[in-house]
Amino acid sequence: MQIFVKTLTGKTITLEVESSDTIENVKQKIQDKEGIPPDQQRLIFAGKQLEDGRTLADYNIQKESTLHLVLRLRGGVIEPSLQVLARKYNCDKVVCRKCYARLHPRAVNCRKKKCGHSNHWRPKKKLK
């Protein structure tokens, strides 16, 4: 039977499948056509995310049904060289205790008028 897979970009992929095919098999066919690894794919049908071990018949997916393909979000790990850069620009500062303005490390008074150019400041907390 033929089913359709619609991506977030609006592209529609046509797949030839059997109702006994598992979701893993469908993801493999999508990889063969589009080059998207199965571990990055999430398939949605009737508002439900489809689980790898189940079959198309388990979800009552019939001929000419449309599945929606969304990509799995990636983790937010910062590359080590970018961490060093972030520390250089963000952590060598002092913070006003009254208005929380970030100030230059050698600042004597705050630059903001709302705290009365206070001289009460603390070092900015370091990134972990």
Curated annotation (Swiss-Prot):
Gene3D superfamilies to which the protein is assigned, alphabetical: 4.10.1060.50, Phosphatidylinositol 3-kinase Catalytic Subunit, Chain A, domain 1 (3.10.20.90)
Keyword Lipid metabolism: no
This protein's GO CC annotations: cytoplasm; nucleus; ribonucleoprotein complex; ribosome
Cross-referenced SMART domains: Ribosomal_L40e (SM01377), UBQ (SM00213)
Crosslink feature (Glycyl lysine isopeptide (Gly-Lys) (interchain with K-? in acceptor proteins)) location: 76
Cross-link Glycyl lysine isopeptide (Lys-Gly) (interchain with G-Cter in ubiquitin), sequence positions: 48
Any one Gene Ontology BP term: translation
Domain Ubiquitin-like: 1-76
InterPro entries: Ribosomal_eL40_dom, Ribosomal_eL40_sf, Ubiquitin-like_dom, Ubiquitin-like_domsf, Ubiquitin_CS, Ubiquitin_dom, Ubiquitin_ubiquitin-like
Residues forming coiled coils: none
GO molecular function: structural constituent of ribosome
Keywords annotated in UniProt: Cytoplasm, Isopeptide bond, Nucleus, Ribonucleoprotein, Ribosomal protein, Ubl conjugation
Pfam families per record: Ribosomal_L40e, ubiquitin
Note: Ubiquitin is encoded by 4 different genes. Uba52 and Rps27a genes code for a single copy of ubiquitin fused to the ribosomal proteins eL40 and eS31, respectively. UBB and UBC genes code for a polyubiquitin precursor with exact head to tail repeats, the number of repeats differ between species and strains.
Protein family (similarity comment): In the N-terminal section; belongs to the ubiquitin family. In the C-terminal section; belongs to the eukaryotic ribosomal protein eL40 family.
Protein name as catalogued: Ubiquitin-ribosomal protein eL40 fusion protein
Upper lineage: Eukaryota, Amoebozoa, Discosea, Longamoebia, Centramoebida
